Curated annotation (Swiss-Prot):
It comes from Porphyromonas gingivalis (Bacteroides gingivalis). This is Lys-gingipain W83. GO terms for cellular component: extracellular region. Cysteine proteinase with a strong preference for substrates with Lys in the P1 position. Hydrolyzes bovine hemoglobin, bovine serum albumin, casein, human placental type I collagen and human IgA and IgG. Disrupts the functions of polymorphonuclear leukocytes. May act as a virulence factor in the development of peridontal disease. Involved in the coaggregation of P.gingivalis with other oral bacteria. Has hemolytic activity; this is mediated by the adhesin domains and does not require the catalytic domain. Ca(2+) 4 binds at D1001, D1003, D1005, H1007, N1043. Ca(2+) 6 binds at D1446, D1448, D1450, N1452, N1490. Belongs to the peptidase C25 family.
């Protein structure tokens, strides 16, 4: 990836570009830069430009012109005219001095006056992000602008910069432009041809240095050199291993071990040292000297470290002050050559304690090993261009847009690119919690924060991205200043436990706008104009996505620093300079990590079954470019890189000399790692399976393999031909010990002359080719008597000897020997004493009876029978095995045995936990086991085993009853093709209407469904919803809507359930009409015809056309709709209503229905001789003979697979037939597979059939084939069946054959078609089983019940359990869900068994709430030993017996009349509560420390406190409070230890400091329970430790003596239960129609229930009310006028206050929406309006 073209001019702050420009065409057709004839001695280069562009600019110093040339940078002395120049980084050989010779160029002068151009603008210095733009002076050198004649640099310049990792770097600058400021003329030199020669170059030393320092990890840097091709002839680069020098604080030795082990396993050669070593030391100087020596020593040995890891904070490894930055830097630990270029990739794992280091390491190991349970977050990134008035648009936005345009997009695999280019930044950091793989922020920063949008170290500590760790880059000031007095931002984000980042790249000093821009996108000459790939050099974004490179976190930082180096000026350093940036940027965390780019690929690899010892190298197959490492116990033995053919030669730096299991790790950039073990030692004599494959469907894993080639477990017979006359029979040897085999040699006077044979076995298997010749006899002439004993450990017969007699050969009969199973060389001899020759049998056959490395499997008996074959004794080998159970298969998952005793070559496991798993299959023989063969499997989904929900327990007498709900809300890891699909869709509209939804304005009035937010339109218990209007504000008036809101496409093969919340925006204008539809086809209005739900929202009262619409929002109601199978879209339609107000919709959720039950068709209900019941048949050939049911009770020759009935179709039935018969199932929508059994006539087996599916109907033309076959030669039985009396001759039935066929999605019907055959006999079908997809049925898991820790019942499928005869006393009952893959957490409930009286409630009353149609029930708690000590609802204010303390002394305290309005906020289920403020409207932020203290209490035995608390504004909710108890006094000093302390949960992120607080949704009321200690006298509620939120509300404080309540209340209306689990002694039943109601309240105890107490109530209608506004609001043109007897404020929709005042406020608006807030007599009014 190379970038050459650089674009136009720079515009620094204080410079604004006009759209006034001119282009001067030059004397070259194109802009072009080339490097040719590249060698160690020289290279040629050419530079040509096709145009100069002039742009008029306005600056603080006046009007100037900016000049730019494609591919050039702006240069010049600060304050002098700025001209463009070209800059290239070049490699310079060792010892060389680069000399430039200009071969030719053209030159032309251009008068800028002819183009109406001003003088060229003065060159400006770089601007730090810490600078105040208003205080930065505009630099103008008057003397420079008075010079006459052309001024400028020499045409070419070269400057040596330093040495970077073995390559000397220089900057080559071309200055094509000179300028005469007085004459206002440009001199342009073009078509420049130069030669750069390297005088004094030492080619040998250059190559030696490059070879010694080379590592593929530095290719990112090498690729940025102009003449980089000089090194393309380098040797075998990929044999260069990765080396890392680690210097760590001594206290980290133990914590560092897991990381060191992993890095060694990954293939890093580690050199680890600690600061307690004398040669390392503890000072900066000693550590630096030690590191430099290590690097130089390594360089001399061609083993220079690639990475330098510093472990610890500055207390153990200090940094040093930068020469340029004057801030802490680690640069000089790795800049060994004395310049500012480092030689090693350096990173610091900064930790102050071993625990913090463990936090960093745990994240790194999970990320690098890819063990995170959900990898989908890797496809998401967060990109933020932070706030800055000028530079956000000039630098921030172009930077982020560049990243999105070229890399972070769908083309590169990213599903979600959360980008925030400018304010508002609402909710931007919430994505860190839900999961992103990369977060990049560019703008301002501090030591402990990203500045705007603000992300502090405190917020980092509160992140919740467990298992979703990311790389973060902060292009901002000082966030990586790691010697700051407290942990800096970069340290905290990496140190936090189970959250945050695994690495952070950031700057220690202030960073600069221009250089940060170059750092990210590459060097260029443009600010404020979108950069292009072609117009920039390589930046950090580009380096991240380099293919086939080792892209590490460190290399990303290097690429950024090199881009800043590229942009530096030659001779006139007006930028801050490259040296500054190499000192500035650091990697905190692990810089050696290779970040994944979206979803990583899967490596294709093959490992040998075992490795031999003492090898110099091993070959391992892996994806090309993979790095392969072999290690054991954290010690690295060898590494290698897979070549283009996918073969890695792993060179062993430490040879393997011991048997055992060794780790093999395969890594490659953007590939998932392979982490395996491989056995070292002799190959196992037990043959493994072959061709193991694994597939997944949902949480179901299917394994398939082939049996060991030596035999088949199904009992088949295999014959292998070896030669002409040798038969080897292999059978189980049950009479030998484990790991042994028996060899038998048998003969029967083969030649009739009493000559015989010997069997010689060499256990060392090293005699073949030497002692045992490849051809010819074993020996000729007389052999030494020790020939056998010296070479062959085992002989048959046992006394075999080279001196042949009839006693030491096998002539007739057999001999045997028992040997250890394993690999042998062997030969079978045929002695010829007369000639003195020892022949080897079978010499004239196809394969002589001599073998090199033959495997004798343990537990087997090998019988070699000698036979005559023609004129010689050639060889045949027969392998026999008549025992189908001679071995079985064992299956392992993740090292755990999960199934053994298998005989089939397939295995299925359902309900597998989500994540990566390794499945292995092992063959278990009688005497031993084979090596495992393994396969990696990734199962998608969630890992959690869902427990039961809502467990309750009760007792009556000694009978205990438990009830619970089935597991829900989490995927069910259980035997199912597709476990619980969970929620298909969930939308709260907090961020508007998603792009995937569709809206249709069918009436065409321009008003469709819209997103709404407070103020004005509050969602259901949230800030936002969607709405549709039948009356519009702002002068719109009456509307007649026909508006559709349509979901994205859904997948509901079995239907689903829709729930949503709906309300009328104005309770007095509530009669909005709407309907819900489902479509199984498209999402146009015409696709929605039959409503599933249609209704008109109930009005609360009589309306008046003049009422103030929108003041009182109606009640939110939840609706539930069943969706039919196949639903693809759901539509919400607002229509047939007019002149109301708005209908609001929120919290739409759709869940897929559970699967249909699996079912099996046995045909037992069908009648012999008739078509099968509930199936459809088609006789397509019209011969009158289709599918029929047959019964074995009617036909002697027939045997059903199960039961007595089958279905059949004939191709011969007394005469030849040509069948085309369909057997069609009923509707099987949702089926994923069909399993069936078939049989044919064993003598005429060719009846062809097909399995077909239809997604539509049951006509023959609706079906397509998914599987077909022609049965042939089954030959497996038939003897047990009788002879056919119907067929022509004996035609026995075959055995039943099982088949399973996968069905495609959308299958509705399945057909079995019998066709394409004739004159055979029949095909039979039986036991057809359909497996259905979807969520689990109740029997997919079972329940286990425990009492007091003892299991008392398991295998339950119902959600209830009863046990009688339970002993009196307290018992704990628990219920656990048992899945195939694991068990859920237990859910428990306490049950008391006794004869206690179950007391009812007391003093139940029912009354109609004032000015509403609600009923309010109140009662007293049931009589009990517990006494209610205090019960306060603050309805009459704060009682005098309570005490308030304004500890901060600001005059604001707890109150029931909060300013500015003076009216109480709504209480919990009442009108009034008590409140304390951290922000008061019109006053601003508060810093409360306010106490609310109870009256004196008497709780000698302790007690229980319950209260309700909420934030008044859900968007400003983070109020901090605590509860204390005092046993002494009631002053603030008496309350020391908090019993409860917390921050209320915020619903959304605060969007604007000036938002109208309190006018949006009130926060959720939470009930809290606190146990009070014995002797408590006072309880205090303290509001403190927070500022600038809004108000905290407190209500319904109840204190009882003794233990917490042990009962709840159940509420009934007209004998129907309407609520349960109620804990307070009041209940509100809203929105009732007029009429009489009977209410009941029951007390539910843990072990019983009370009688129901009742009360009656008559709800009457409300009187007509016409609300009057205490203000007037008019809009005339664009002028808004508010008149009132109070205060008025006008806001925009971002919450910014635009105007405010008393009595009359006038504001001239732009077009858009506004909110008006009026406060009159302590009451607040808010109205939303639109200005056109």
């Amino acid at each position: 990836m190379r970038k050459l073209l650089l674009l136009i001019a720079a515009s620094l702050l204080g410079v604004g570009l006009y759209a006034q420009s001119a282009k001067i065409k030059l004397d070259a057709p194109t802009t072009r830069t080339t490097c040719t004839n590249n060698s160690f001695k020289q290279f040629d280069a050419s530079f040509s430009f096709n145009e100069v562009e002039l742009t008029k600019v306005e600056t603080k110093g006046g009007t100037f012109a900016s000049v730019s040339i494609p591919g050039a940078f702006p240069t010049g002395e600060v304050g002098s005219p700025e001209v463009p120049a070209v800059r290239k980084l070049i490699a310079v050989p060792v010892g060389a001095t680069p000399v430039v010779r200009v071969k030719s160029f053209t030159e032309q002068v251009y008068s800028l006056n002819q183009y109406g151009s001003e003088k060229l603008m003065p060159h400006q210095p770089s601007m730090s992000k810490s600078d105040d733009p208003e205080k930065v002076p505009f630099v103008y050198n008057a003397a420079a602008y008075a010079r006459k004649g052309f001024v400028g640099q020499e045409l070419t310049q070269v400057e040596m910069l330093g040495t970077m990792r073995g390559v000397r770097i220089a900057a080559l600058t071309i200055n094509p432009v000179q300028y005469d400021v007085v004459a206002n003329q440009l001199k342009v030199r073009n078509n420049i041809e130069i030669e750069v020669s390297f005088q004094g170059a030492d080619e040998v030393a250059t190559q030696r240095l490059y070879d010694a320092s080379f590592s593929p990890y530095f290719e990112t840097a090498y690729k940025q050199l102009f003449n980089r091709d000089v090194y393309t002839d380098h040797g075998d680069l990929y044999n260069t291993p990765v080396r890392m020098l680690v210097v760590a604080g001594a206290k980290f030795k133990e914590a560092l071990k897991p990381w060191l082990t992993w890095k060694a396993q990954k293939g890093f050669y580690l050199d680890v040292h600690y600061t307690d070593e004398a040669e390392v030391g503890t000072t900066n100087a000693s550590i630096k000297a030690f590191i430099h020596k290590k690097y130089n020593d390594g360089l001399a040995a061609s083993a220079a470290p690639v990475f330098l890891a510093l472990v610890g904070d500055t207390d153990v490894i200090s940094g040093e002050k930068g020469k340029k930055t004057k801030k802490v830097t680690d640069l000089y630990y790795s800049a060994v050559d004395g310049d500012y270029f480092p030689e090693m990739y350096t990173f610091r794992m900064s930790a102050s304690s071993p625990e913090e280091l463990t936090n960093i390491i745990d994240k790194v190991l999970m990320y690098e090993k890819a063990t995170m349970p959900d990898k989908s977050y890797l496809e998401k990134v967060l990109l933020i261009a932070g706030a800055d008035y000028s530079w956000n648009s000039q630098v921030g936005q172009p930077t982020i847009k560049y990243g999105m345009q070229y890399y972070y997009n769908q083309e590169h695999g990213y599903t979600d690119v959360y980008n925030y280019l400018k304010a508002p930044y609402t909710g931007c950091y919430s994505h860190l919690n839900t999961g992103v793989s990369f977060a990049n922020y560019t703008a301002h920063g501090s030591e402990t924060a990203w500045a705007d949008p603000l992300l502090t170290t405190s917020q980092l500590k509160a992140l919740t991205n467990k298992d979703k760790y990311f790389l973060a880059i902060g292009n901002c000031c000082i966030t990586a200043q790691f010697d700051y007095v407290q942990p800096c931002f970069g340290e905290v984000i990496t140190r936090v436990k189970e959250k945050g980042a695994y690495a952070y790249i950031g700057s220690s000093p202030n960073s600069y706008w221009g250089e940060d821009y170059y750092w990210s996108v590459g060097a260029n000459a443009v600010f404020g104009v979108q950069p292009t790939f072609e117009g920039t050099s390589m930046g950090s974004y580009d380096a991240t996505f380099l293919e086939d490179s080792y892209n590490t976190v460190n290399s990303i930082m290097w690429a950024g620093n090199l881009a800043a180096t590229h942009a530096g000026n030659i001779g006139n350093i007006t930028h801050i300079g490259a040296h500054y940036y190499w000192e500035a940027y650091h990697v905190l965390g692990d810089g050696s990590v290779m970040p994944y780019r979206a979803m990583p690929k899967t490596n294709t690899y093959t490992l040998p079954a075992s490795l031999p010892q003492n090898q110099a190298s091993y070959s391992i197959q892996a994806s090309a470019g993979s790095y392969v490492a072999i290690s054991k116990d954290g010690v690295l033995y060898g590494t290698g890189v897979a070549n283009a053919s996918g073969v890695a030669t792993v060179s062993m730096t430490k040879q393997i000399t011991e048997n055992g299991n060794y780790d093999v790790v395969i890594t490659r950039s953007n590939y998932l790692p392979v982490i395996k073990q491989i056995q070292v030692g002799e190959p196992s004599p037990y043959q493994p399976v072959s061709n193991l494959t694994a597939t997944t469907q949902g949480q179901k894993v299917t394994l398939k393999w082939e049996a060991p080639s030596a035999k088949k477990a199904e009992g088949s017979r295999e014959v292998k031909r070896i030669g002409d006359g040798l038969f080897v029979t292999i059978e189980p040897a049950n009479d030998v010990r484990a790991n042994e085999a028996k060899v038998v040699l048998a003969a029967d006077n083969v030649w009739g002359d009493n000559t015989g044979y010997q069997f010689l076995l060499d256990a060392d298997h090293n005699t073949f080719g030497s002692v045992i010749p490849a051809t010819g006899p074993l020996f000729t002439g007389t052999a030494s008597s020790n020939l056998y004993s010296a070479n062959f450990e085992y002989l048959v017969p046992a006394n075999a000897d080279p001196v042949v007699t009839t006693q030491n050969i096998i002539v007739t009969g057999q001999g045997e020997v028992v040997i250890p199973g394993g690999v042998y060389d062997y030969c079978i001899t045929n002695p010829e004493p007369a000639s003195g020759k020892m022949w080897i049998a079978g010499d004239g056959g196809n394969q002589p009876a001599r073998y090199d490395d033959f495997t004798f499997e343990a537990g087997k008996k090998y019988t070699f029978t000698m036979r005559r074959a023609g004129m010689g004794d050639g060889t045949d080998m027969e392998v026999e095995d008549d025992s189908p159970a001679s071995y079985t298969y064992t299956v392992y998952r993740d090292g755990t045995k999960i199934k053994e005793g298998l005989t089939a070559t397939t295995f299925e496991e359902d309900g597998v936990a989500a994540g990566n798993h390794e499945y292995c299959v092992e063959v278990k023989y009688t005497a031993g086991v084979s090596p495992k063969v393994c396969k990696d499997v990734t199962v998608e989904g969630s890992n959690e085993f869902a427990p039961v929900q809502n467990l309750t327990g009760s007792s009556v007498g000694q009978k205990v009853t438990l009830k619970w709900d089935a597991p829900n809300g989490t995927p069910n890891p259980n035997p199912n093709p597709n476990p619980n699909p969970g929620t298909t869709l969930s939308e709260s509209f907090e961020n508007g209407i998603p792009a995937s939804w569709k809206t249709i304005d069918a009436d065409g009035d321009g008003h469709g469904w819209k997103p709404g937010n407070a103020p004005g339109i509050a969602g259901y218990n949230s800030n936002g919803c969607v709405y549709s209007e039948s009356f519009g504000l702002g002068g719109i008036g009456v509307l007649t809507p026909d508006n559709y809101l349509i979901t994205p496409a859904l997948d509901l093969p079995n239907g689903g359930k829709l729930t949503f919340w709906v309300c009328a925006q104005d309770a007095n204008y509530a009669s909005e009409h709407y309907a819900v539809y489902a479509s199984s086809t498209g999402n146009d209005a015409s696709n929605f015809t039959n409503a599933l739900l249609e209704e008109t929202i109930t009005a609360k009262g009589v309306r008046s056309p003049k009422a103030i619409r929108g003041r009182i929002q109606g009640t939110w109601r939840q609706k539930t709709v069943d969706l039919p199978a196949g639903t693809k879209y759901v539509a919400f339609r607002h229509f047939q209503s007019t002149d109301m107000f708005y209908i609001d919709l929120d919290e739409v959720e759709i869940k897929a229905n559970g699967k249909r039950a699996d079912f099996t068709e046995t045909f037992e209900s069908s009648t012999h001789g008739e078509a099968p019941a509930e199936w459809t048949t088609i006789d397509a050939d019209g011969d009158g003979q289709g599918w029929l049911c047959l019964s074995s009770g009617q036909l002697d020759w027939l045997t059903a697979h199960g039961g007595s009935n089958v279905v059949s179709s004939f191709s011969w039935n007394g005469m030849a037939l040509n069948p085309d018969n369909y057997l069609i199932s009923k509707d099987v929508t949702g089926a994923t597979k069909v399993k069936y059994y078939y049989a044919v006539n064993d003598g005429f087996p060719g009846d062809h059939y097909a399995v077909m599916i239809s997604k539509t109907g049951t006509n023959a033309g609706d079906f397509t084939v998914v599987f077909e076959e022609t049965p042939n030669g089954i030959n497996k039985g038939g003897a047990r069946f009788g002879l056919s009396t119907e067929a022509n001759g004996a035609k026995p039935q075959s055995v039943w054959i099982e088949r399973t066929v996968d069905l495609p999605a959308g299958t509705k019907y399945v057909a079995f078609r019998h066709y394409n055959c004739s004159d055979l006999n029949y095909i039979l079908l039986d036991d057809i089983q359909f497996t259905m997809g979807g969520s689990p049925t109740p029997t997919d898991y079972t329940y286990t019940v425990y009492r007091d820790g003892t299991k008392i019942k398991e295998g339950l499928t119902e959600t209830t359990f009863e046990e009688d005869g339970v002993a009196t006393g307290n018992h704990e009952y628990c219920v656990e869900v048992k899945y195939t893959a694991g068990v859920s957490p237990k859910k428990c409930v306490d049950v008391t068994v006794n004869s206690t009286q179950f007391n009812p409630v007391q003093n139940l009353t029912a009354e109609q709430a004032p000015n509403s149609m609600d009923a309010i029930l109140k009662w007293n708690a049931p009589a009990s030993k517990r006494a209610e000590v205090l019960n306060e609802d603050f309805e009459n204010g704060i009682p005098a017996s309570w005490k308030t303390i304004d500890a901060d002394g600001d005059g604001n305290n707890w109150t029931t009349t909060p300013p500015p309005g003076g009216s109480s906020f709504a209480g919990h289920n009442s009108a009034i509560c008590v409140s304390s403020a951290s922000h008061i409207n019109f006053e601003g932020p508060q810093n409360p420390d306010n106490y609310l203290v109870t009256p004196e209490l008497s709780l000698p035995g302790g007690g229980t406190l319950t209260f309700w608390v909420c934030a008044q504004d859900a968007n400003y909710a983070s109020e901090h409070y605590a509860v204390y108890a005092s046993s002494t006094g009631n002053d603030a000093s008496n309350f020391a230890n908090a019993l409860l302390e917390e921050v209320l949960t915020a619903k959304t992120v605060v969007t604007a400091p000036e938002a109208i607080r309190g006018t949006r949704a009130q926060g959720t009321w939470y009930q809290k329970t606190v146990q009070l200690p014995a002797g408590t006298k006072y309880v205090a509620f303290r509001h403190f430790g927070c500022t600038d939120f809004f108000w905290i509300n407190l209500d319904d404080v109840v204190i009882t003596s003794g233990n917490a309540p042990s009962y709840t209340y159940t509420i009934y209306r007209n004998n129907t239960q309407i609520a349960s689990g109620v804990t307070e002694t009041t209940y509100r039943d809203p929105d009732l129609a007029t009429g009489f109601y009977t209410y009941g309240v029951k007390v539910v105890y843990p072990n019983g229930e009370s009688a129901i107490e009742t009360a009656t109530l008559n709800i009457t209608s409300l009187a007509d009310v016409t609300a009057q506004k205490p203000y007037t609001l008019t809009v005339v043109g664009k002028t808004i006028t508010v008149t009132c007897q109070g205060e008025a404020m006008i806001y925009d929709m971002n919450g910014r206050r635009l105007a405010a005042g008393r009595n009359t406020v006038v504001y001239t608006a732009q077009g858009g929406h506004y909110a008006v807030m009026v406060v009159v007599d302590g009451k607040s009014y808010v109205e939303k309006l639109a200005v056109k």
